[in-house]
Amino acid sequence: MYTAKEVILSQIKPALGCTEPAAIALNGAYLKEYVKNAKKIQLTINTNLMKNAMYVPIPNTGKKFGVKLAFALGYLCGDKTKGLNVFENIDKKCIEEAEKYINKIELDIVEGREIYIKSEAEGCEVITKKFHDYISSIKTSEKVITFESKNIDNNISDTEKWLKKISFDTLYRLIEKEKDFDFVKNAVDVNFELSKIGLNSDCGLNIGKSYKGDDIFSKIVSITVSASDARMEGVNYPAMSLVGSGNHGISAILPVWVYGKEKNFQENEIFKAVALSMLITIYIKLFIGRLSAICGAAFASGCGVAGGIAYLESNNKEVSKKAVSYVIQDINGVICDGAKMACSLKVRLGAKSGYEAAMFALEGKPVFSDGILENDITKSIQNLSRVSEAMYNVDGSIVEIMKNKII
């Protein structure tokens, strides 16, 4: 049995910009340690990773993007000790060098939904697997090194296996056993700072700024989406990522926190509800997949927001579960067509659906076990896993469309 704190801390970490380009760059930074100034590099990534790395702006580049560019920046200028903040020190000179270097990189796309990156040069091979910052092996002409990178919790796999075996109700027991929720404070602070950047400057699509009302819903959407606007712009400030995604962290954390602050709940109560939202998001993501055809920033985090806000107001797990069920019925089929600045629109959708679902549940509106919804919410989420698997061909079609435009 793991604690709520252990589960959450295993799944959060700061990440600068979108995590897929960062993962690619980090792989390049590791390759540089063994092969410098390679005349040719063979880069292989899986389809879903490519989908989320192709068109999203890279931090500190002035909105430049591209899979090869991300790798070249990491290979030429990246610091592997920075982990998913690998783009932190990118400057103009590095960008110019990287743009020239991309002609030396050959890119191959292979089928697969699980994170996979392999770079090869002059007899050296670096492989990233399963997690964005997990360098699983490094092979040189002299030796093979298999190891856990410093940026990954060795117990993540065991934690995830355990989570997929427990019931949804167990999440509430984990939350109730925790007494002090200060461990989520840093995540709230980091993402709120990112939101302030989005609110105070022109970032991404500037969707967050469109919500100017003083009502609680407008404030939730404005603050949450502004953080995503800033992140997808590629500003030089990290998001606190959740389950490998900055937008998941933003959209699971900020709506619940804003709601609690606006309603004047005690800080520990708010952090408790935020922790529940994060747990629900993690739980659902493990069933639909880290990289899938379903947009987790809208759907999984939306479920977390609904459950967190409803629990904060009612302190009743049945009301909270009902709220989650509303989101399942509302937006369960929203697709992910790759990371880009427009992702802030889907973050908006998750915040909206989560907030409204919580209100419906608190008003006592009925929930019916139709469609993919079951009387047992654990089974409903297992059904979502089946839907996600069945959408593999949908995902493939999206990736094929994007491959025809590949840069």
Curated annotation (Swiss-Prot):
Annotated GO biological process: L-cysteine catabolic process to pyruvate
Pfam families with a match to the protein in the record: SDH_alpha
One of the record's GO molecular function terms: L-cysteine desulfhydrase activity
PANTHER family named in the record: UPF0597 PROTEIN YHAM
Family, per entry: Belongs to the UPF0597 family.
Record-given protein name: UPF0597 protein NAMH_0191
Organism: Nautilia profundicola (strain ATCC BAA-1463 / DSM 18972 / AmH)
Lineage, opening ranks: Bacteria, Pseudomonadati, Campylobacterota, Epsilonproteobacteria, Nautiliales
